[in-house]
Protein backbone atom coordinates (compact mmCIF):
# COMPACT_ATOMS: atom_id res chain seq x y z
CA UNK A 1 0.00 0.00 0.00
CA UNK A 2 1.43 3.36 -1.04
CA UNK A 3 0.51 6.92 -1.79
CA UNK A 4 0.41 8.34 -5.30
CA UNK A 5 0.34 12.05 -6.04
CA UNK A 6 -1.23 13.34 -9.27
CA UNK A 7 0.22 16.63 -10.51
CA UNK A 8 -1.04 19.29 -12.91
CA UNK A 9 1.65 21.95 -13.29
CA UNK A 10 0.74 25.20 -15.03
CA UNK A 11 2.95 28.18 -15.83
CA UNK A 12 2.28 29.73 -12.40
CA UNK A 13 0.35 26.98 -10.61
CA UNK A 14 0.89 23.54 -9.11
CA UNK A 15 -2.26 21.51 -8.47
CA UNK A 16 -2.17 18.12 -6.77
CA UNK A 17 -4.30 15.29 -5.46
CA UNK A 18 -2.87 12.64 -3.12
CA UNK A 19 -4.34 9.12 -3.21
CA UNK A 20 -3.91 6.04 -1.09
CA UNK A 21 -3.53 3.26 -3.63
CA UNK A 22 -4.81 0.82 -4.66
CA UNK A 23 -7.85 1.78 -2.56
CA UNK A 24 -8.15 5.01 -4.61
CA UNK A 25 -8.91 6.95 -1.44
CA UNK A 26 -8.32 10.71 -1.68
CA UNK A 27 -6.16 11.82 1.25
CA UNK A 28 -5.53 15.44 0.31
CA UNK A 29 -5.77 17.85 -2.57
CA UNK A 30 -4.82 21.43 -3.19
CA UNK A 31 -2.83 23.96 -5.13
CA UNK A 32 -0.09 26.54 -5.01
CA UNK A 33 -1.03 29.51 -7.19
CA UNK A 34 0.70 32.64 -8.47
CA UNK A 35 4.12 30.98 -8.37
CA UNK A 36 6.82 33.58 -8.95
CA UNK A 37 4.68 36.49 -7.73
CA UNK A 38 5.20 38.43 -4.48
CA UNK A 39 2.90 36.12 -2.54
CA UNK A 40 1.44 32.77 -3.51
CA UNK A 41 -1.76 31.31 -2.01
CA UNK A 42 -1.33 27.74 -0.75
CA UNK A 43 -4.52 25.69 -0.27
CA UNK A 44 -4.76 22.12 1.00
CA UNK A 45 -7.98 20.22 1.75
CA UNK A 46 -7.74 16.99 3.74
CA UNK A 47 -9.72 14.73 6.01
CA UNK A 48 -13.47 15.18 6.17
CA UNK A 49 -13.61 18.96 6.10
CA UNK A 50 -10.16 20.32 6.99
CA UNK A 51 -8.87 23.23 4.94
CA UNK A 52 -5.37 24.68 5.31
CA UNK A 53 -4.59 28.07 3.78
CA UNK A 54 -1.57 30.32 3.84
CA UNK A 55 0.26 32.85 1.71
CA UNK A 56 3.91 32.16 1.04
CA UNK A 57 6.79 33.40 -1.04
CA UNK A 58 7.16 30.78 -3.77
CA UNK A 59 9.91 31.65 -6.20
CA UNK A 60 9.51 28.71 -8.58
CA UNK A 61 7.98 25.26 -9.01
CA UNK A 62 10.77 23.60 -7.03
CA UNK A 63 9.86 25.78 -4.06
CA UNK A 64 6.19 24.92 -4.61
CA UNK A 65 6.92 21.18 -4.52
CA UNK A 66 8.89 21.56 -1.28
CA UNK A 67 6.10 23.62 0.31
CA UNK A 68 3.41 21.09 -0.65
CA UNK A 69 5.35 18.08 0.64
CA UNK A 70 6.50 19.85 3.81
CA UNK A 71 2.96 20.98 4.60
CA UNK A 72 1.67 17.44 4.07
CA UNK A 73 4.10 16.35 6.78
CA UNK A 74 3.29 19.27 9.11
CA UNK A 75 -0.43 18.52 8.77
CA UNK A 76 0.34 14.85 9.54
CA UNK A 77 -1.14 13.73 6.26
CA UNK A 78 2.11 11.85 5.61
CA UNK A 79 4.96 11.06 8.00
CA UNK A 80 7.76 11.41 5.47
CA UNK A 81 8.52 11.75 1.77
CA UNK A 82 9.12 7.99 1.71
CA UNK A 83 5.37 7.36 1.88
CA UNK A 84 4.96 8.69 -1.65
CA UNK A 85 5.54 5.75 -3.97
CA UNK A 86 4.46 7.26 -7.28
CA UNK A 87 4.08 10.61 -9.03
CA UNK A 88 1.80 11.13 -12.02
CA UNK A 89 2.11 14.21 -14.22
CA UNK A 90 -0.52 15.54 -16.57
CA UNK A 91 1.12 16.39 -19.91
CA UNK A 92 -1.03 18.04 -22.56
CA UNK A 93 0.75 17.13 -25.81
CA UNK A 94 2.22 13.72 -26.54
CA UNK A 95 2.32 14.11 -30.30
CA UNK A 96 2.61 10.89 -32.29
CA UNK A 97 5.38 9.65 -30.01
CA UNK A 98 3.20 8.75 -27.02
CA UNK A 99 0.10 6.58 -27.39
CA UNK A 100 -0.05 5.67 -23.70
CA UNK A 101 1.19 6.83 -20.33
CA UNK A 102 4.92 6.20 -19.83
CA UNK A 103 7.56 6.10 -17.13
CA UNK A 104 9.48 9.37 -17.29
CA UNK A 105 13.13 9.01 -18.23
CA UNK A 106 15.55 11.73 -19.30
CA UNK A 107 14.73 10.87 -22.91
CA UNK A 108 10.98 11.10 -22.29
CA UNK A 109 11.41 14.46 -20.56
CA UNK A 110 13.39 15.74 -23.54
CA UNK A 111 10.63 14.60 -25.90
CA UNK A 112 7.99 16.34 -23.77
CA UNK A 113 10.04 19.53 -23.96
CA UNK A 114 10.53 19.15 -27.71
CA UNK A 115 6.76 18.81 -28.17
CA UNK A 116 6.24 22.30 -26.74
CA UNK A 117 5.42 23.72 -30.17
CA UNK A 118 2.28 21.55 -30.17
CA UNK A 119 1.17 22.97 -26.79
CA UNK A 120 3.23 26.11 -26.05
CA UNK A 121 0.97 27.16 -23.18
CA UNK A 122 1.14 23.78 -21.45
CA UNK A 123 4.05 21.43 -22.20
CA UNK A 124 6.82 23.76 -20.96
CA UNK A 125 4.99 24.16 -17.63
CA UNK A 126 4.34 20.41 -17.44
CA UNK A 127 8.07 19.79 -17.95
CA UNK A 128 8.96 22.29 -15.22
CA UNK A 129 6.73 20.40 -12.78
CA UNK A 130 8.35 17.09 -13.73
CA UNK A 131 11.85 18.46 -13.16
CA UNK A 132 10.87 19.94 -9.80
CA UNK A 133 9.52 16.63 -8.50
CA UNK A 134 12.52 14.77 -9.89
CA UNK A 135 14.75 17.03 -7.79
CA UNK A 136 12.81 16.41 -4.59
CA UNK A 137 11.81 12.76 -5.12
CA UNK A 138 14.54 11.44 -7.45
CA UNK A 139 13.98 7.74 -6.74
CA UNK A 140 10.18 7.72 -6.91
CA UNK A 141 8.70 6.42 -10.20
CA UNK A 142 7.23 9.31 -12.20
CA UNK A 143 4.71 8.72 -14.98
CA UNK A 144 3.60 11.08 -17.75
CA UNK A 145 -0.10 10.87 -18.61
CA UNK A 146 -0.86 12.58 -21.92
CA UNK A 147 -4.08 14.40 -22.80
CA UNK A 148 -3.61 13.34 -26.41
CA UNK A 149 -2.89 9.63 -25.84
CA UNK A 150 -6.52 8.49 -25.72
CA UNK A 151 -7.07 9.97 -29.18
CA UNK A 152 -4.18 8.00 -30.72
CA UNK A 153 -6.78 5.45 -31.86
CA UNK A 154 -8.37 7.93 -34.29
CA UNK A 155 -8.15 6.74 -37.90
CA UNK A 156 -6.31 8.83 -40.48
CA UNK A 157 -9.62 9.80 -42.07
CA UNK A 158 -10.36 11.76 -38.89
CA UNK A 159 -6.94 13.03 -37.83
CA UNK A 160 -5.63 14.27 -41.18
CA UNK A 161 -6.34 17.73 -42.56
CA UNK A 162 -6.86 18.28 -46.29
CA UNK A 163 -3.45 19.88 -46.72
CA UNK A 164 -0.44 18.75 -48.77
CA UNK A 165 0.34 15.32 -47.33
CA UNK A 166 4.02 16.08 -46.83
CA UNK A 167 3.05 18.77 -44.27
CA UNK A 168 1.87 15.88 -42.12
CA UNK A 169 4.97 13.82 -42.86
CA UNK A 170 7.45 16.65 -42.31
CA UNK A 171 5.78 18.83 -39.69
CA UNK A 172 3.24 16.63 -37.93
CA UNK A 173 0.31 18.76 -39.16
CA UNK A 174 -2.66 16.70 -37.93
CA UNK A 175 -5.39 16.56 -35.32
CA UNK A 176 -4.29 15.41 -31.86
CA UNK A 177 -7.24 16.36 -29.67
CA UNK A 178 -7.11 17.02 -25.93
CA UNK A 179 -8.90 16.25 -22.65
CA UNK A 180 -8.26 12.58 -23.41
CA UNK A 181 -7.80 11.62 -19.77
CA UNK A 182 -11.19 13.11 -18.90
CA UNK A 183 -12.97 11.49 -21.85
CA UNK A 184 -11.36 8.15 -20.95
CA UNK A 185 -12.40 8.40 -17.29
CA UNK A 186 -16.05 9.24 -17.94
CA UNK A 187 -16.30 6.53 -20.60
CA UNK A 188 -15.16 3.93 -18.06
CA UNK A 189 -17.66 5.26 -15.51
CA UNK A 190 -20.44 5.33 -18.12
CA UNK A 191 -19.93 1.63 -18.81
CA UNK A 192 -20.28 0.87 -15.10
CA UNK A 193 -23.39 3.06 -14.82
CA UNK A 194 -24.97 1.33 -17.82
CA UNK A 195 -23.91 -2.11 -16.59
CA UNK A 196 -22.25 -3.03 -19.86
CA UNK A 197 -18.65 -3.63 -20.99
CA UNK A 198 -17.09 -0.48 -22.43
CA UNK A 199 -16.05 -2.50 -25.49
CA UNK A 200 -19.73 -2.93 -26.44
CA UNK A 201 -20.72 0.74 -26.26
CA UNK A 202 -20.95 3.74 -28.55
CA UNK A 203 -20.60 6.94 -26.52
CA UNK A 204 -20.39 10.68 -27.14
CA UNK A 205 -18.62 12.43 -24.28
CA UNK A 206 -19.04 16.16 -23.71
CA UNK A 207 -16.30 17.80 -21.62
CA UNK A 208 -17.82 21.25 -21.10
CA UNK A 209 -15.69 23.65 -19.09
CA UNK A 210 -13.55 26.72 -19.71
CA UNK A 211 -11.98 24.52 -22.36
CA UNK A 212 -14.53 22.27 -24.02
CA UNK A 213 -14.31 19.25 -26.29
CA UNK A 214 -16.55 16.49 -27.58
CA UNK A 215 -15.41 12.96 -28.41
CA UNK A 216 -16.98 10.07 -30.29
CA UNK A 217 -16.00 6.80 -28.57
CA UNK A 218 -16.53 3.57 -30.47
CA UNK A 219 -16.24 0.40 -28.38
CA UNK A 220 -13.83 2.05 -25.93
CA UNK A 221 -11.67 3.76 -28.57
CA UNK A 222 -11.60 7.43 -29.52
CA UNK A 223 -12.97 7.64 -33.06
CA UNK A 224 -13.07 11.43 -33.45
CA UNK A 225 -12.79 14.54 -31.30
CA UNK A 226 -13.55 18.23 -31.67
CA UNK A 227 -10.21 19.75 -30.67
CA UNK A 228 -7.56 19.70 -33.35
CA UNK A 229 -3.84 20.29 -33.77
CA UNK A 230 -4.19 22.37 -30.61
CA UNK A 231 -6.96 22.84 -28.01
CA UNK A 232 -8.06 25.98 -29.90
CA UNK A 233 -10.21 24.08 -32.39
CA UNK A 234 -13.74 22.77 -31.93
CA UNK A 235 -16.73 24.32 -30.19
CA UNK A 236 -17.00 27.81 -28.71
CA UNK A 237 -15.19 28.00 -25.34
CA UNK A 238 -14.77 30.48 -22.50
CA UNK A 239 -12.07 32.56 -24.19
CA UNK A 240 -11.19 30.42 -27.23
CA UNK A 241 -12.88 30.86 -30.58
CA UNK A 242 -13.21 27.24 -31.56
CA UNK A 243 -13.45 26.55 -35.30
CA UNK A 244 -12.84 29.59 -37.52
CA UNK A 245 -12.33 29.83 -41.30
CA UNK A 246 -8.53 30.21 -41.77
CA UNK A 247 -9.16 32.85 -44.44
CA UNK A 248 -10.93 34.98 -41.84
CA UNK A 249 -7.82 34.83 -39.65
CA UNK A 250 -5.66 36.08 -42.53
CA UNK A 251 -8.25 38.77 -43.34
CA UNK A 252 -8.34 40.02 -39.74
CA UNK A 253 -4.55 40.08 -39.49
CA UNK A 254 -4.52 42.49 -42.43
CA UNK A 255 -7.33 44.63 -41.03
CA UNK A 256 -5.73 44.77 -37.56
CA UNK A 257 -2.22 45.33 -38.95
CA UNK A 258 -0.98 42.20 -37.21
CA UNK A 259 2.18 40.67 -38.63
CA UNK A 260 3.05 38.34 -35.75
CA UNK A 261 0.93 35.15 -35.87
CA UNK A 262 1.39 34.73 -32.11
CA UNK A 263 -0.47 38.01 -31.58
CA UNK A 264 -3.41 36.70 -33.59
CA UNK A 265 -3.30 33.41 -31.72
CA UNK A 266 -3.48 35.34 -28.44
CA UNK A 267 -6.71 36.96 -29.64
CA UNK A 268 -8.17 33.61 -30.67
CA UNK A 269 -7.09 31.91 -27.42
CA UNK A 270 -7.74 34.58 -24.79
CA UNK A 271 -10.09 37.26 -26.18
CA UNK A 272 -12.63 35.22 -28.12
CA UNK A 273 -15.28 32.62 -27.30
CA UNK A 274 -17.91 33.61 -24.74
CA UNK A 275 -15.72 36.50 -23.62
CA UNK A 276 -15.54 37.94 -27.11
CA UNK A 277 -19.24 37.47 -27.79
CA UNK A 278 -20.69 38.69 -24.49
CA UNK A 279 -17.91 40.32 -22.47
CA UNK A 280 -17.63 37.51 -19.91
CA UNK A 281 -15.98 34.10 -19.91
CA UNK A 282 -18.01 33.02 -16.86
CA UNK A 283 -20.94 30.83 -17.88
CA UNK A 284 -22.60 31.29 -14.50
CA UNK A 285 -22.66 35.06 -15.05
CA UNK A 286 -23.99 34.67 -18.59
CA UNK A 287 -26.75 32.37 -17.33
CA UNK A 288 -27.77 35.04 -14.82
CA UNK A 289 -27.95 37.58 -17.66
CA UNK A 290 -29.59 35.25 -20.19
CA UNK A 291 -33.21 36.44 -19.92
CA UNK A 292 -32.37 40.16 -19.95
CA UNK A 293 -29.21 40.49 -22.05
CA UNK A 294 -29.31 39.73 -25.78
CA UNK A 295 -25.52 39.31 -26.02
CA UNK A 296 -25.45 36.79 -23.17
CA UNK A 297 -28.32 34.95 -24.83
CA UNK A 298 -26.53 34.96 -28.18
CA UNK A 299 -23.28 33.66 -26.66
CA UNK A 300 -25.06 30.78 -24.91
CA UNK A 301 -27.12 29.96 -27.99
CA UNK A 302 -23.96 29.83 -30.13
CA UNK A 303 -22.29 27.61 -27.51
CA UNK A 304 -25.24 25.19 -27.61
CA UNK A 305 -25.47 25.30 -31.40
CA UNK A 306 -21.82 24.33 -31.85
CA UNK A 307 -22.25 21.45 -29.40
CA UNK A 308 -25.35 20.16 -31.21
CA UNK A 309 -23.56 20.28 -34.58
CA UNK A 310 -20.70 18.13 -33.30
CA UNK A 311 -23.00 15.69 -31.53
CA UNK A 312 -25.06 15.33 -34.71
CA UNK A 313 -21.95 14.68 -36.77
CA UNK A 314 -20.69 12.09 -34.29
CA UNK A 315 -24.04 10.32 -34.21
CA UNK A 316 -23.66 9.92 -37.96
CA UNK A 317 -20.04 8.73 -37.64
CA UNK A 318 -20.91 6.23 -34.93
CA UNK A 319 -24.17 5.21 -36.62
CA UNK A 320 -26.02 5.95 -33.40
CA UNK A 321 -25.01 6.01 -29.75
CA UNK A 322 -25.89 4.30 -26.51
CA UNK A 323 -25.34 7.40 -24.39
CA UNK A 324 -24.30 11.02 -24.19
CA UNK A 325 -21.97 11.62 -21.24
CA UNK A 326 -21.78 15.16 -19.87
CA UNK A 327 -18.91 16.28 -17.63
CA UNK A 328 -16.57 19.13 -16.50
CA UNK A 329 -17.42 22.45 -14.85
CA UNK A 330 -20.26 23.71 -17.04
CA UNK A 331 -21.58 20.25 -17.80
CA UNK A 332 -21.60 19.17 -14.16
CA UNK A 333 -23.13 22.32 -12.66
CA UNK A 334 -25.39 23.93 -15.27
CA UNK A 335 -28.76 22.14 -15.39
CA UNK A 336 -30.22 24.69 -17.82
CA UNK A 337 -27.38 24.05 -20.25
CA UNK A 338 -27.90 20.30 -20.10
CA UNK A 339 -31.62 20.78 -20.78
CA UNK A 340 -30.95 23.07 -23.76
CA UNK A 341 -28.61 20.54 -25.32
CA UNK A 342 -31.03 17.65 -24.80
CA UNK A 343 -33.95 19.65 -26.19
CA UNK A 344 -32.02 20.21 -29.43
CA UNK A 345 -31.37 16.47 -29.80
CA UNK A 346 -34.88 15.05 -29.30
CA UNK A 347 -35.00 13.98 -32.96
CA UNK A 348 -32.28 11.41 -32.20
CA UNK A 349 -34.04 10.03 -29.14
CA UNK A 350 -32.32 12.12 -26.46
CA UNK A 351 -34.62 13.10 -23.59
CA UNK A 352 -33.82 14.04 -20.01
CA UNK A 353 -36.14 14.13 -17.02
CA UNK A 354 -36.33 17.73 -15.68
CA UNK A 355 -36.59 16.46 -12.11
CA UNK A 356 -33.56 14.17 -12.41
CA UNK A 357 -31.67 17.05 -14.04
CA UNK A 358 -31.93 19.34 -10.99
CA UNK A 359 -28.58 18.20 -9.60
CA UNK A 360 -25.02 19.46 -9.60
CA UNK A 361 -21.78 17.50 -9.58
CA UNK A 362 -23.24 14.05 -8.89
CA UNK A 363 -23.23 10.90 -10.99
CA UNK A 364 -26.66 10.23 -12.41
CA UNK A 365 -28.62 8.90 -15.37
CA UNK A 366 -30.71 11.94 -16.36
CA UNK A 367 -32.73 10.16 -19.04
CA UNK A 368 -36.46 9.72 -19.26
CA UNK A 369 -37.62 6.11 -19.17
CA UNK A 370 -38.38 6.10 -22.91
CA UNK A 371 -35.20 7.82 -24.12
CA UNK A 372 -33.49 5.92 -26.95
CA UNK A 373 -30.12 7.45 -26.10
CA UNK A 374 -29.22 7.70 -22.41
CA UNK A 375 -27.90 10.99 -21.04
CA UNK A 376 -25.45 10.51 -18.18
CA UNK A 377 -24.04 13.15 -15.86
CA UNK A 378 -20.62 11.98 -14.65
CA UNK A 379 -18.22 14.28 -12.76
CA UNK A 380 -14.75 13.88 -14.22
CA UNK A 381 -11.75 12.80 -12.17
CA UNK A 382 -8.63 13.14 -14.29
CA UNK A 383 -6.42 12.89 -11.21
CA UNK A 384 -7.78 9.45 -10.35
CA UNK A 385 -7.12 8.28 -13.89
CA UNK A 386 -3.57 9.63 -13.58
CA UNK A 387 -3.09 7.77 -10.28
CA UNK A 388 -4.39 4.56 -11.86
CA UNK A 389 -1.95 4.94 -14.74
CA UNK A 390 0.93 5.43 -12.31
CA UNK A 391 0.04 2.13 -10.65
CA UNK A 392 -0.33 0.33 -13.98
CA UNK A 393 2.81 1.69 -15.64
CA UNK A 394 5.05 1.41 -12.58
CA UNK A 395 4.01 -2.21 -11.96
CA UNK A 396 4.77 -3.17 -15.56
CA UNK A 397 8.36 -1.91 -15.47
Swiss-Prot record:
Task: Cite the NCBIfam families for this sequence.
Answer: ackA
What is this protein's name?
Answer: Acetate kinase
Q: What is any one of the record's Gene Ontology cellular component terms?
A: cytoplasm
| Primary site of residence | cytoplasm
Active site annotation, chain numbering: 147 (proton donor/acceptor)
In the UniProt record, the gene name given for this protein reads: ackA
UniProt keyword annotations, A-Z: ATP-binding, Cytoplasm, Kinase, Magnesium, Metal-binding, Nucleotide-binding, Transferase
GO biological process annotation, one example: acetyl-CoA biosynthetic process
Where in the chain is the site Transition state stabilizer? 179, 240
Protein family membership: Belongs to the acetokinase family.
Q: What superkingdom heads the lineage?
A: Bacteria
Look up the EC number in the record and give it. 2.7.2.1
Q: Which cofactor does it need?
A: Mg(2+); Mn(2+)
| Residues noted as binding substrate in the record, renumbered to the chain | 90
Instruction: Recite the UniProt cofactor note for this protein.
Output: Mg(2+). Can also accept Mn(2+).
Q: What does this protein do?
A: Catalyzes the formation of acetyl phosphate from acetate and ATP. Can also catalyze the reverse reaction.
